[in-house]
UniProtKB/Swiss-Prot annotation:
Gene designation: wecA
Intervals, Periplasmic compartment: 1-2, 67-68, 127-131, 179-186, 234-241, 315-317
GO CC annotation, single: plasma membrane
Protein name: Undecaprenyl-phosphate alpha-N-acetylglucosaminyl 1-phosphate transferase
Record's function text: Catalyzes the transfer of the GlcNAc-1-phosphate moiety from UDP-GlcNAc onto the carrier lipid undecaprenyl phosphate (C55-P), yielding GlcNAc-pyrophosphoryl-undecaprenyl (GlcNAc-PP-C55). It is the first lipid-linked intermediate involved in enterobacterial common antigen (ECA) synthesis, and an acceptor for the addition of subsequent sugars to complete the biosynthesis of O-antigen lipopolysaccharide (LPS) in many E.coli O types. The apparent affinity of WecA for the polyisoprenyl phosphate substrates increases with the polyisoprenyl chain length.
């Protein structure tokens, strides 16, 4: 396998997904698979919800053109296909949370039974003692599947954010696997990025606002499920290339945001799935940043956290228990900012005003 072949495959995936996306958005408008504006959604017009369907089509295309072995490829496509189909039905008809959670659990069970993919160990997060899960690992795996799907679903609040965060996660996993010699799984991660990039271009309006599309629940479900599937492939077993604690850093922002928001809702006596405007992107936008600026800032923060995980994994210098402690400290800092969102927003606004005053009041230098 050489770089020219890999590059050619990735470009082919990108072009195929782009063409499929333009085709799918036309079909979506005819069948009513569109997002309509309401009091929580600020977009205008009917936006096709075909990002996830197009990404899935791109991955099917990937598995069709590549000639290297990807473990459990057929099983993954079947499981992911079911989730994308249910997600598309939810986008169109608004399926209840209980039905979706039941189907996600069923798919998780199929993954564990037929793919033998489940959490058997959490690594050496308590020092020299490996935390082996035993039968409890099956239940924790179902929770991990549900958590990953919902974590990526909840960050899909502003243009580009879901695509940006998912690309960060797949890039981090892909780099670790590539340098470890796990090229097949690494190419799968890079193929996910190639299939997501066309969606980001249309979602951000780079090719024109009239071509705008949304990912939809089908897309966020697919991305979350794919992330947890690849992490289970690579963090478990005797010769795993990624430590379980590194996975936390790779999906840090979506995971932190989900846990912090659900905890906040439960404390208020609300359903953990009830919508609100307390996510990290809402906090940043209340501080005076635009939607595009919030997207860039959050994606860069996710890339920074993922880089910490990648460097620690690659160097083998920092013990796993230390990485867990550092992650928990980062999480508590994140939770503190979310809990005091208005204070943080006011502080950032004051800093921005001072910077503008200092910039405006500085004397012009002349020769």
């Amino acid at each position: 396998m050489n770089l020219l072949t890999v590059s050619t495959d990735l470009i082919s995936i990108f072009l195929f997904t782009t063409l499929f996306l333009f085709f799918a958005r036309k079909v979506a408008k005819k069948v009513g698979l569109v997002d309509k504006p309401n009091f929580r959604k600020r977009h205008q017009g009917l936006i096709p919800l075909v990002g996830g369907i197009s990404v899935y089509a791109g991955i099917c295309f990937t598995f069709g053109i590549v000639d290297y072995y990807i473990p459990h490829a057929s099983l993954y496509l079947a499981c992911a296909g079911v989730l994308v189909f249910i997600g598309a039905l939810d986008d169109r008809f608004d399926i209840s949370v209980k039905i979706r959670a039941t189907i996600q659990a069923a798919v998780g069970i199929v993954m564990m039974v037929f793919g033998k993919l489940y959490l058997s160990s959490l690594g050496y997060i308590f020092g020299s003692w490996e935390m082996v899960l035993g039968p409890f690992g099956y239940f924790l795996t179902l929770f991990a599947v549900w958590a990953a799907i919902n974590a990526f679903n909840m960050v899909d609040g502003i243009d580009g954010l879901l695509g940006g965060l998912s690309c960060v996660s797949f890039a981090a996993i892909g780099m670790i696997l590539w340098f470890d010699g796990q090229t097949s799984l690494a190419i799968w991660c890079f193929a996910m990025i190639a299939a997501i990039l066309p969606y980001i271009m249309l979602n951000l309006g780079i090719l024109g606002r009239r071509y705008k599309v949304f990912m939809g629940d089908a897309g966020s479900t697919l991305i979350g499920f794919t992330v947890i599937w690849i992490l289970l492939e690579t963090t478990q077993g005797k010769t795993h290339p990624i430590s379980p604690v590194t996975a936390l850093w790779i999906i840090a922002i979506p995971l932190m945001d989900m846990v912090a928001i659900m905890y906040r809702r439960l404390r208020k006596g609300m359903s953990p799935f009830s919508p609100d405007r307390q996510h990290i992107h809402h906090l940043i936008m209340r501080a005076g940043f635009t939607s595009r600026q919030a997207f860039v800032l959050i994606t860069l923060a996710a890339a920074l956290l993922a880089s910490i995980g990648v460097l620690a994994e690659y160097s083998h210098f920092v013990p796993e228990w230390v990485m867990l402690v550092l992650f928990l400290l980062a999480f508590f800092l994140y939770g503190y900012c979310i809990k005091r969102a208005w204070k943080v927003a006011r502080f950032i606004k004051r800093v921005k005003r001072r910077l503008r005053r200092n910039r405006g009041g500085s004397p012009n230098l002349t020769k």
